[in-house]
Design a protein with these regions (language model features):
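Short beta-strands and strand-coil junctions in structured, solvent-facing domains, enriched
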Residues: 34-36, 79-84, 104, 123, ...
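Hydrophobic alpha-helix feature that most strongly marks membrane-spanning transmembrane helices
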Residues: 4, 50, 54, 98-102, ...
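Surface-exposed interaction regions enriched in Ser/Thr/Asp/Glu
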Residues: 30, 194-198, 206-298
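An aromatic-glycine-centered, glycine-rich loop/turn in mixed alpha/beta architecture
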Residues: 84-183
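Short, glycine-/Ser/Thr-/acidic-enriched flexible segments
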Residues: 16, 31-34, 76-80, 142, ...
C-alpha cells in the first residue's frame, strides 16, 4: 500500500471540478488518524505514484472537505409502555445517531440516507412511536481579513427553492454566522432572496436591514454560493468560541445528502436538536384527536 494510514480515498479527473483543470487526477485522502495530511506526506505519496502515471497526467493530493448535517428531531413516545424518562430516551437516541455518524458516514463514498437515520431513531426503544426529523447542511469558509475577495462555497447538493422568491421576506433558505466588514461596526449576516441573490444585512431592533442585496449569488440546482467583493474586517464568535471561519447553513432540496469528489458528509450531533415528548394521543389526553398537534416536516 502506498499510504496504509488512509481510511477513505476518492479519485476524479480535474476536468470534473467547478473550475476544470486538465491533465490532473485529484486524489482525496482521509487519514485513519482523522488529521489532514502534511505537505511532506502528500508529496511523498505523489512520488510513490509516479511509476503509475499515465502520459502527462499528474496526481494531486487534496484534503477532505466536510459538509455537516444538522438535525432537528421531534420524537414522540408512549409513556405507558416504558419506565424510561424522556431524558433517558434522548440520551439513547443521541448515542444511536453518534454511532451512525461514526460507523456509516465520514467517508468519501458514504451518503447520508435520511430514512436510515429516522429508522434508527424509531428503533431505539419500543415505546417510540414516531419522529419528525428535519435536515439542514452547513459549510464554512475562511475569509482573508481586510481584503476584498471573491469566495466560492460548494454544497454540491441542490438546495430548497420550490418557486422564485421563496421565503424572501424571512431570508430564504440561507443563513450565516456573523462578521463585520471594513468601514462598519455593525455585525453582518447573509441570507438569500429566493431568486438567486445572496444578501448581506444587519439587525436593527431585530429587523433585517440590508447593506447589500446583491452581495453574491446562490445556484439552487447545485448549491454553489458565490460571494463577490466581500471585505471582512473581523469574524464573530461561533457558539461562544473564537472563530476564524464564517459558517453558511442551507436547507437542502433532498433529505439525502451526497458527498461529491473531495467531500465527506458528517452529522454535527452536538449542534443538532433532539426533543423527546410524551404522545398525548395514545396517552389518553387527546379527545378523538382534538387538540393533538403535529410537528412540521419543513
Amino acid at each position: 500500500s502506498i499510504y496504509p494510514n488512509a481510511l477513505s480515498v476518492s479519485a476524479w479527473g480535474g476536468e470534473d471540478d467547478e473550475t476544470p483543470r486538465y491533465g490532473i487526477v485529484k486524489i482525496g485522502i482521509k487519514a485513519a488518524s482523522g488529521s489532514t495530511l502534511t505537505e511532506t506526506t502528500k508529496q511523498d505519496i505523489v512520488n510513490k505514484l509516479k511509476p503509475y502515471n499515465v502520459a502527462s497526467v499528474s496526481p494531486q493530493i487534496v484534503d477532505p472537505e466536510t459538509t455537516s448535517v444538522l438535525l432537528t428531531s421531534t420524537v414522540k413516545y408512549n409513556t405507558s409502555t416504558t419506565t424510561k424518562s424522556s431524558d433517558t430516551l434522548k440520551s439513547e437516541i443521541i448515542t444511536a445517531i453518534t454511532n451512525y455518524n461514526t460507523n456509516t458516514l465520514q467517508k468519501f463514498d458514504s451518503i447520508y440516507r435520511h430514512s436510515k437515520l429516522t429508522g434508527l431513531i424509531d428503533s431505539v426503544d419500543t415505546s417510540i412511536l414516531s419522529n419528525i426529523t428535519n435536515v439542514k447542511i452547513r459549510k464554512s469558509f475562511t475569509p482573508s481579513l481586510a481584503s476584498s475577495q471573491k469566495y466560492n462555497i460548494y454544497f454540491r447538493n441542490a438546495v430548497f427553492n420550490p418557486h422564485t422568491g421563496h421565503n424572501m421576506a424571512a431570508g430564504g433558505i440561507l443563513s450565516s454566522t456573523g462578521f463585520k466588514v471594513t468601514g462598519s461596526d455593525l455585525e453582518q449576516f447573509l441570507d438569500d432572496d429566493g431568486s438567486g441573490n445572496v444578501r448581506r444585512y444587519y439587525l436593527a431592533s431585530g429587523i433585517r436591514t440590508y447593506s447589500n442585496e446583491t452581495q453574491g449569488t446562490i445556484n439552487y440546482s447545485n448549491g454553489e454560493i458565490t460571494l463577490n467583493s466581500l471585505n471582512v474586517a473581523s469574524i464573530s464568535n461561533i457558539r461562544g468560541a473564537t472563530s476564524t471561519v464564517v459558517e453558511l447553513t442551507v436547507t437542502p432540496d433532498s433529505n439525502d445528502i451526497v458527498p461529491v469528489r473531495d467531500q465527506i458528509v458528517e452529522l454535527d450531533v452536538a449542534n443538532s436538536g433532539i426533543t423527546v415528548t410524551a404522545d398525548t394521543f395514545v396517552g389518553g389526553s387527546a379527545d378523538a384527536g382534538v387538540g393533538y398537534t403535529t410537528t412540521s416536516s419543513y
